[in-house]
């Protein structure tokens, strides 16, 4: 099936670019219906415009609370015809208003091997803890902070001379591939969502017929 995507960004939009490039190359059966940024100057908006994708700026500062901000996002996404939402460097915590409008159809890419190092500055957290391997995770979004069901992960070794900047750039390259990998699997019908069986439970997700991870990055350094 062709995925109708709404992509939410806050910055440079490199993961958005990976999606656009994969679509253009015929590697991803999807259409980006709308790119929304909460920041007017986000460079990712230019990436979308260059690809002929509609854009919108919806500032969180123009809304009194998170719920009303998310309601504005839902309205714009619905009008554009999006049925899946990708948080691609979107630096806002979403609420049930957005999640209920797109049940089990909101994805996020996070720069760690969750559940390790959730929240902001995951790369710095990895370095501070002295781990030897970190990476990135694509997961469905739920009401928690980076706690939703994991769809796929890719590992990146932490090198002895890594700085936060160097590690971040190497993880980012893996993010691009992993996000496209997961979206392509969803488009191919390999995503199964099992609804929660109790109020306290949460949805269980399976990606079937495809690898759940892209493996460990290799390096010649």
Regions found by a protein language model. Name each.
Residues 1-4, 27, 57, 160, ...:
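An anion-binding loop in the catalytic cleft
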Residues 1-43:
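N-terminal Rossmann-like dinucleotide-binding module
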Residues 22, 88-202:
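Donor/substrate-binding cores of folate-linked one-carbon enzymes
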Residues 30-68, 72:
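Short, surface-exposed acidic-centric catalytic microdomains
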Residues 33, 83, 104:
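Conserved acidic residues
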Residues 37-38, 61-62, 66-67, 80-96:
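N-terminal glycine-rich "phosphate-gripper" loop used for MgATP/nucleotide binding
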Residues 54, 83, 132:
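Residue-level detector of anion-binding/catalytic polar loops
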């Amino acid at each position: 099936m062709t995925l109708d995507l709404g992509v939410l960004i806050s910055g440079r939009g490199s993961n958005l670019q990976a999606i656009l490039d994969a679509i253009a190359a015929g590697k991803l059966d999807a259409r980006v219906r709308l790119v929304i940024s909460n920041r007017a100057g986000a460079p990712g908006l230019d990436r979308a415009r260059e690809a002929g994708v509609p854009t919108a700026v919806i500032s969180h500062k123009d809304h009194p609370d998170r719920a009303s901000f998310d309601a504005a996002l839902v309205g714009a996404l619905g009008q554009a015809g999006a049925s899946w939402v990708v948080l691609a460097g979107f630096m806002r915590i979403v609420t049930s208003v957005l999640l209920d409008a797109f049940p089990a159809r909101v994805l996020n890419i996070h720069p760690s091997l969750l559940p390790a190092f959730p929240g902001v500055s995951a790369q710095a957290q990895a370095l501070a803890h002295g781990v030897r391997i970190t990476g990135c995770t694509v997961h469905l979004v739920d009401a928690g902070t980076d706690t939703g069901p994991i769809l796929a992960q890719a590992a990146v070794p932490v090198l002895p001379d890594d700085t936060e900047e160097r590690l971040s750039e190497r993880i980012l390259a893996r993010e691009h591939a992993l996000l496209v990998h997961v979206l392509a699997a969803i488009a191919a019908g390999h995503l199964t969502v099992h609804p929660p069986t109790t109020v306290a439970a949460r949805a269980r997700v399976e990606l079937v017929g495809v690898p759940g991870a892209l493996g460990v990055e290799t390096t010649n350094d």
